[in-house]
Amino acid sequence: MGRTIRFGVSLDSDLLEKFDALCDDRCYQTRSEAIRDLIRNTLVQQEWEDTDREIAGTLTIVYDHHKSDLAQRLTEIQHDHHGIIITSLHVHLDHHNCLEVLVLKGPGADVRTLSQRLISTKGVKHGKLSLTTTGQDLT
């Protein structure tokens, strides 16, 4: 980790007031902590755009496991991409609906491809990919 450097930021007073309210709402003890998180989030967003860069994330899907061979198709797709699936969690929401969470890590293009294949599978009711960083380039 590098040394900490102080720098000044000039803001419109209305913008600063809104930023301070955001800091309070999110329980930041200092503006610096909030600004660091904003910078990190922007850098992580930039990482996601690099399809070769390794990223991590979770994919959550909801589906009716009674739909004809849907569970089998989802399993086959996952086996086709086993190298980027770290682990998975399967939850029975009710008699028909299942929630599955996959923890993914790999090249951005591969993570997106797997996610789109699963989300677009006929019978999947909802899917959401939530990306983050591996943290290697952040301090």
Swiss-Prot record:
Record note on cofactor: Binds 1 nickel ion per subunit.
GO molecular function ontology, one term from the record: nickel cation binding
Name assigned to this protein: Putative nickel-responsive regulator
Keyword annotations from UniProtKB, A to Z: DNA-binding, Metal-binding, Nickel, Transcription, Transcription regulation
Cofactors named for this entry: Ni(2+)
Binding site for Ni(2+): H79, H90, H92, C98
Family of the protein in this entry: Belongs to the transcriptional regulatory CopG/NikR family.
PANTHER family with a match to the protein in the record: NICKEL-RESPONSIVE REGULATOR
Species whose genome carries this gene: Nitratidesulfovibrio vulgaris (strain DSM 19637 / Miyazaki F)
UniProt keyword annotation of Transcription regulation present: yes
Domain of life (superkingdom): Bacteria
The keyword Metal-binding is annotated on this UniProt entry: yes
CDD domains: RHH_NikR_HicB-like
GO BP terms, alphabetized: response to nickel cation
Function: Transcriptional regulator.
